[in-house]
Amino acid sequence: MPDQITLQIDGRPVTVRAGATIRDAIDAAGSETPTLCYDPDLTPPSACRICVVEVKGSRALVPSCSRIAEDGMEVSTDSPRVRRARKGVIELLESSVDTSLAPTIQRFAERYEARPERYAGGATVAQPVRESDNWLYVRDYARCILCYKCVEACGSDVQHTFALTAAGRGFDAHIDTGFDVPLGESPCVYCGNCVAVCPTGALMGRTEFEMRQAGTWDEPKQTETETICSYCGVGCGLQLHIQDNRIVKVSSPRDNPVTHGFLCVKGRFGYEYLHGGSERQRKRLAGSGSRESAPVGMRTTESS
């Protein structure tokens, strides 16, 4: 088997390693294809279908994120058929899901002249915002597009916790904790890596959620500072998002050689202790029931 193959991307020859995906070839050609469920560090679920391309001789459009490229393949990334398919996917998403916090989808909607009002009235199962689940992040499934990134990040690709899974079919499809148990009774370790990969704001850190609710979240005003987490000796790289001299969010650069963008509960959410935590968080930590549901390693201890 040859080490490299050559195919055509929009009429241009491109050489890539054998086993590369069509998306890899598109990137090598310097072209762009839209994606929603794709993440370079996660297994492609081929769920969103917005990255589909047309392959000469193929009856159906194929997902470029997971389809393996073949020698001699001729690929069209922006044919009329491809554009119609992408437009339809975006219209269906925007007609049934709140995408107001998903600028990527809005940008694609403008690019493909999507008209979601054509499908007005349809809606996915909108599970409620579960503010009482935990004090670290909020789940708002009315914004969920079922990209499955959170499931992949929680599973064997990153965390190996397997607290999240996909459940239901059709309009009943949703992300579940497994038998719909409360989050505190699931294997969740509150690392927040599901939050980090969510493209729509369906999963959001509590500080950001509360600031958005209060109208004080101002991303253009925020500055970013890179540092190293001091909770242990691993040396994870942190990116502190600062607004009004307060840390409002912590992430990790995706190109960081230690984390690859993923953190543990202490690295992602431990910053609250720098500010003493919110009053509600302190009460929850001090409460008899909430303290037990707090992540291990961040529970408060009672003084004797």
PLM regions and their residue ranges:
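N-terminal cofactor/phosphate-binding cores enriched in small/glycine residues
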Residues: 13-71, 84-85
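N-terminal export/assembly segments and adjacent metallocofactor-ligating motifs
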Residues: 2-19, 27, 55-57, 72-96, ...
